[in-house]
From Swiss-Prot:
GO annotation, biological process: DNA repair; DNA replication checkpoint signaling; meiotic cell cycle; replication fork arrest
Compositionally biased residues, Acidic residues: 583-597, 954-963, 1108-1118
Subunit-structure text: Component of the fork protection complex (FPC) consisting of tof1 and csm3.
Stated name of the protein: Topoisomerase 1-associated factor 1
Record organism: Aspergillus fumigatus (strain ATCC MYA-4609 / CBS 101355 / FGSC A1100 / Af293)
Name of one Pfam family that matches: TIMELESS
Length: 1176
């Protein structure tokens, strides 16, 4: 313990002397170097007990009392370098087989872990902590130097040997002691990786011995990297509790290391360093030149003071020889002398985490670069997926071993290794392109090596963590998460450019999932807007994320034109005034969870994505200020960072046409200095030309805009709000149109409860009175009263005017009360009452302020009658004890009624035909699809409805696939039935061919049918009866109906055009003035089976028209009969119809044995005159 120790300031008692005496005695009794053999350490008689006592002092005194006195004493006594490291060397050389020595070695490890535990400066430190922390930090650096460069042995390899027996035990057989030994071993490696020289303390010795390069080389030479690879590749199988410690070790090894330099060869690295040195020398020379311009001369070092006369006739004093150069320099010197005490914003004190700072770059030597690159490549090939999958799951379930800092370490380490994988692949492609021998061939599924962080679970975890860090203002965590998100996007972009189709499909799927959520878009915009002095690391991360996200999203939206995003908005629910809140409170509490889920479903909806609309969110002064703050570091930025800022300003000024946002004095001054100086960009850089052209175009646009808008000269001093931007861009203020409110839903009174208008008015009035809207009801009554008086005066004036009738004027419905005017639009029950009293709204638009009038069709008596009903309801008390609630009788007007009303209005409108050649067919389509008709179709529909109601609660509703399958089956059945039809009514190509014999036979049969029909009609006119049709004819007719061969008899529309042209050329046999009305007697050929839709009385009159009736031009509105009271049934037997008994005015068409009914004669009438005919 006499070797080098940490310096102690004498004369100051920082530790209790009794504590120091006890600790020193334990260290002395532990052992020491023998005088005979100075290189050999000799243990004391009770060394193991001494080590355990020292451990108890650390635990019971320092940890229990939250002090560092024992650790300070051990550092002063040089316990680590003077005793513990020699004991471990002794065990590794000669004592591994001794169980006693193994226990001593383990006891040494138990002391090394707490003594090398990293120290952090935090807000909960006591005075004792502040006193001892600097000394202990310096002591730990000495511990690390002794561990890494111990002369007589490899300490790290020795520590690993202590833990190897516990690693060899299967996980299921390990004891708590084995798990503790593994934990001690890994924590010791973690501590060695964390310890680094403190820049605020004076360094002792060579810093290279404790640098990152020395740590990496020691880990490689002493098999620590091999241990880490073995454990990382078996996490989850053999090592489940060590995942977080392994993550910490990796984080502290790779943090701050430049990935690009890591994968460079020696020649590239040498060229890179030469370029960096040249840039530094050039910066130095430029600074010297700038200084030489204003530097004092050798003989001009005496004081200089001048007076500067300003515009307001005031005089200012400026000192210094440099002010004599020119007036511009003088004014610049005056500006430099001004100071602005900017008010400091009180912020939450940020915790200093020097050990976890990953924004500070670290340089490593060539040997360490080679060793680290080998370890990184092997880790990517074997340990990446198992480790990060297991750590992510542990963080998500909040395991006990997970600390808050581990989330930041996880995301940063993932981002670093993803970037390493991309750079490795790029260098391998470059080597193959140059013809060099590749170190390793990339497998076709090589992206599977990092697939564990490209799944949906990682994206959800990342988005949730980013939102949590943003909400809680955790700057460091959010920076790590933004870096991780950026590297994931870049990796996916590289996957999309892969020659493998599988990689391209996976990349497209990942981009679809990332870009589908609009909350991700909004979060990135909010992060960029919210920058306020969070540091350069945060600034670099957020600008890089915005740049990569915008570029990839623009490319993806161009490839996927129909891209949709899911937007989630918080539902705006109006508070309802419910008087029965106490009664229904319990029910609402039970259903609250379901209602919340329903609300989430309602507010999540898809919409088409517009990239220009999204890019416009970055066109605001906050985002511009963020990138301006980033650009102010232009002297320290590399080419990629300068290009990032250039692309953003180019997008703002030229793509989005929002260059007005850049017209601010400090921004223009920054751009000018970047190009013209002082302190300009290096003109040899490739990015300089692009920046020069951009600045030239921006200043050119600004001058042009000043000529157009002189007000811009004043606005150059300030940031631009949206209204100012719009005015400067277009020359006028933005015209905003307030969105009109939607009218309330239409209401109606239950038709079954109120048959008449008076009953409906009573119900509505009672409900409005119950809802405390009596003032509105009285207003309607007053309007009716005044309208009745005015209408009475108008009617009396008409009576005195001598009989000349003028239309009654419409009376406007107005109100001086503003609340009443609003209620005319927003109160649905008032609108219902106004509709019931027959007020009408002018115009088609239902907007606030629409005019209502009393129509001219209402006379004074009707108005007074309506008012009397309202007054009667107001005087009658509302019965509260009624069995039914009147408010339940008012319901929302159903969409079916509205649709039916619209259909009724459009029923008589002829829109023409979309088919080629519009044949004017007044009675329907020329060729109907011939649906299958059923005599009991109505009954079948009723049974189906009842069956559905019964099965509604038992079976689930059919989904869209089942409905589509049923629809296809119905279509196939209809096509199969149509295929069986043999009728020549359907037009074929062969109809154009002429067959004279067939035409003659057709004309002969048609002439015979016309004569027979004319004879039957003539007999019916003379005798008033219809002759019986023969049984054979009836059976033939029914047989033809079943075969669908006489489809022409069921509808007049089924005749072909050729038949109609022939019938129109035939003349009438009798008197030209003979008008024969439609008869109820029909020939057997005219009785066909029609569809159920053709069974109404009107349909029968419209469809059952024979060829003779068309020829004689019958009028369907006239029916002939000699005696209307005589209905003589001639035959009513053999009626096998299954349908219901026909109505008196209809004929049973479904039965095969239709009964012939005597047609009652009727006088023929034309133009109101009775016409007698000789035919009678």
């Amino acid at each position: 313990m006499d070797e080098e120790g940490a310096p102690l300031s004498e004369g100051v008692q920082v530790v209790d002397p009794d504590v120091r005496a006890h600790v020193y005695s334990l260290v002395t009794a532990l052992g020491g170097f023998n005088g005979e053999s100075a290189d050999r350490y000799v243990l004391g008689d009770d060394a193991l007990a001494c080590l355990r006592d020292i451990k108890r002092w650390l635990k019971l005194y320092d940890e229990k009392h939250n002090r560092m006195d024992v650790a300070r004493c051990l550092g002063e006594a040089n316990l680590v370098n003077g005793d513990l490291l020699p004991i471990l060397t002794l065990w590794s050389t000669s004592g591994q087989k001794s169980k006693h020595m193994s226990r001593i070695a383990l006891a040494c490890l138990e002391l090394l872990v707490p003594l090398t535990w990293p120290l952090e400066v935090h807000s909960e430190m006591t005075v004792n902590h502040h006193r001892h922390t600097p000394y202990l930090q310096q002591a730990q650096v000495l511990y690390k130097r002794g561990i890494l460069s111990h002369g007589s042995g490899s300490i790290l390899r020795t520590i690993i040997r202590i833990g190897l027996p516990s690693m060899a035990v299967p996980r299921s057989e390990r004891t708590t002691r084995d798990e503790g030994i593994l934990k001690l071993m890994l924590y010791f490696l973690r501590n060695i990786a964390v310890i680094s020289p403190n820049a605020r303390l004076a360094a002792e010795g060579d810093e290279e011995e404790t640098s990152r390069s020395a740590t990496i080389n020691a880990f490689q030479n002493q098999d620590a990297f091999a241990l880490l690879l073995t454990m990382c590749s078996n996490v989850g199988e053999d090592f489940s509790l060590q995942d977080v410690v392994l993550l910490e070790i990796l984080f502290h090894i790779v943090k701050g290391v430049n990935v690009e330099k890591l994968f460079m060869n020696d020649a590239q690295r040498k060229a890179k360093r030469t370029d960096e040195l040249g840039e530094l020398l050039q910066k130095e020379s430029s600074l010297r030149r700038e200084y030489a311009k204003n530097a004092p001369t050798r003989h001009g070092r005496f004081g200089t003071m001048i007076w500067v006369k300003r515009d307001d006739a005031k005089v200012s004093t400026v000192s210094g020889q440099d002010v004599l150069k020119d007036s511009q320099t003088t004014l610049h010197k005056m500006d430099q002398s001004k100071k602005w005490n900017k008010p400091q914003i009180r912020r939450r004190a940020a915790e200093v985490t020097a050990n976890n700072d990953f924004n500070t770059p670290v340089n490593i030597n060539s040997t360490a670069t080679k060793n680290l690159r080998m370890f990184v490549e092997e880790f990517l090939d074997s340990g990446f997926n198992p480790l990060f999958t297991h750590v992510r799951k542990a963080i998500e379930r909040e395991a006990d071993r997970v600390m808050d800092i581990n989330t930041r370490q996880f995301f940063y380490t993932v981002a670093w290794f993803l970037e390493a994988e991309r750079v490795r692949r790029a260098h391998q492609r470059e080597k193959r392109h140059l013809g060099d021998t590749p170190l390793k061939e990339i497998e076709p599924d090589s992206f599977a090596l990092v697939a564990s962080v490209l799944n949906q679970e990682t994206f959800v975890f990342l988005n949730r963590s980013m939102q949590y860090s943003y909400d809680n203002k955790d700057v460091e965590d959010l920076t790590a998460e933004m870096r991780c998100f950026t590297q994931i996007l870049l990796t996916v972009q590289e996957m999309a450019q892969s020659p493998l189709e599988e990689d391209q499909e996976i990349a497209d799927n990942i981009q679809n999932r990332i870009f589908y959520e609009e909350t991700t878009h909004d979060r990135i915009v909010a992060i960029v807007r919210g920058y306020k002095d969070q540091g350069f690391g945060y600034l670099d991360a957020c600008t890089e994320l915005a740049h990569v996200f915008l570029r990839m999203l623009e490319h993806y939206s161009k490839e996927n034109v129909d891209m949709h995003v899911r937007s989630r908005r918080r539902a705006k629910r109006k508070a309802k005034q419910a008087k029965q809140a106490d009664i229904e409170g319990d029910d609402e509490e039970e259903a609250s969870e379901e209602e919340d889920l329903m609300d989430v479903e309602r507010i999540s909806k898809e919409r088409k994505f517009d990239f220009r609309r999204f890019a416009a969110k970055f066109c605001n002064q906050s985002c511009v200020d963020t990138f301006i703050a980033f650009t102010k570091y232009y002297r320290e930025l590399n080419v990629d960072q300068l290009k990032r800022a250039h692309r953003y300003f180019y997008r703002i000024a030229f793509k989005q046409e929002m260059s007005v946002l850049l017209f601010r004095l400090d921004i223009i001054n920054l751009f000018y200095r970047m190009i013209k100086g002082p302190g300009a960009l290096d003109s040899n850089k490739p990015i300089f030309k692009e920046w020069e052209e951009l600045v030239r175009q921006i200043i050119r646009r600004m001058i042009k805009k000043i000529d157009q808008r002189p007000a811009l000269i004043t606005e150059l001093l300030f940031s631009k709000i949206n209204s100012t931007v719009f005015y400067l861009e277009y020359g006028h203020e933005k015209q905003t149109i307030s969105a009109s409110k939607r009218p309330p839903a239409e209401l109606e009174v239950e038709p079954r409860e109120a048959k008449t208008i008076d009953e409906k008015i009573r119900i509505v009035v009672h409900v409005m009175v119950k809802d405390e809207h009596t003032d509105l009801v009285k207003w309607v009554s007053d309007v009716l009263n005044s309208a009745a008086d005015e209408r009475e005066a108008w009617e009396s004036q008409e009576q005195h005017s001598g009989g000349q009738k003028a239309p009654n004027p419409m009376i406007p419905v107005k109100s001086d009360n503003e609340s009443c005017q609003k209620a005319m639009f927003s109160n649905a029950k008032l609108r219902l009452l106004m509709s019931l009293v027959r007020f009408e709204r002018l115009g088609m638009e239902d907007v606030p302020g629409a005019s209502w009038v009393v129509p001219s069709s209402l006379n004074s008596q009707e108005l007074r009658h309506t008012r009397s009903i309202i007054e009667q309801c107001l005087t009658e008390p509302v019965t509260e004890n009624s069995d039914r609630d009147l408010s339940q009788l008012i319901r929302r007007k159903s969409g079916n009624n509205t649709r039916r009303d619209r259909d009724d209005q459009m029923a008589n409108v002829d829109f023409g035909s979309d088919s080629e050649g519009d044949d004017n067919v007044p009675d329907g389509p020329l060729f109907p699809p011939n649906p299958r008709s059923r005599a009991n179709a109505l009954e079948q529909l009723k049974k189906q409805r009842k069956k559905r109601r019964k099965q509604a609660g038992e079976e689930e509703e059919p989904d869209e696939e089942d409905l589509e399958a049923r629809r296809r089956a119905r279509l196939e059945n209809a096509l199969a039935r149509q295929a069986k039809i043999k009728s020549d009514l359907y037009i074929h190509a062969s109809d154009e061919e002429t067959d004279e014999e067939a035409d003659q036979e057709f004309f002969r049969l048609e002439e015979q049918r016309r004569k027979e029909q004319a004879e039957r009609i003539r007999k019916a006119l003379l005798h008033g009866v219809v002759e019986e049709v023969s049984e054979n004819s009836r059976k033939k007719s029914s047989g033809r109906k079943r075969q669908s061969d006489q489809y022409t008899a069921s509808t007049a529309d089924s005749q072909s055009k050729r038949q109609r042209r022939l019938q129109q050329t035939e003349g009438l046999d009798g008197n030209d003035d003979l008008v024969v009305a439609g008869t109820e007697a029909r020939s057997p050929d005219s009785l066909g089976q029609g569809s159920p839709s053709l069974k109404g009385a009107n349909d029968v009159e419209d469809t059952l028209v024979t060829s003779e009736e068309n020829e004689l031009d019958f009028d369907d509105d006239l029916a002939f009969s000699r005696n209307r009271t005589r209905d003589k049934v001639l035959s009513a037997e053999n009626d096998d119809s299954d349908t219901e008994p026909p109505a008196p005015d209809t004929i049973d068409e479904d039965g095969e044995e239709a009964a012939a009914v005597a047609a009652p004669p009727r006088r023929r009438v034309r133009a109101g005159f009775v016409i007698e005919s000789d035919s009678e």
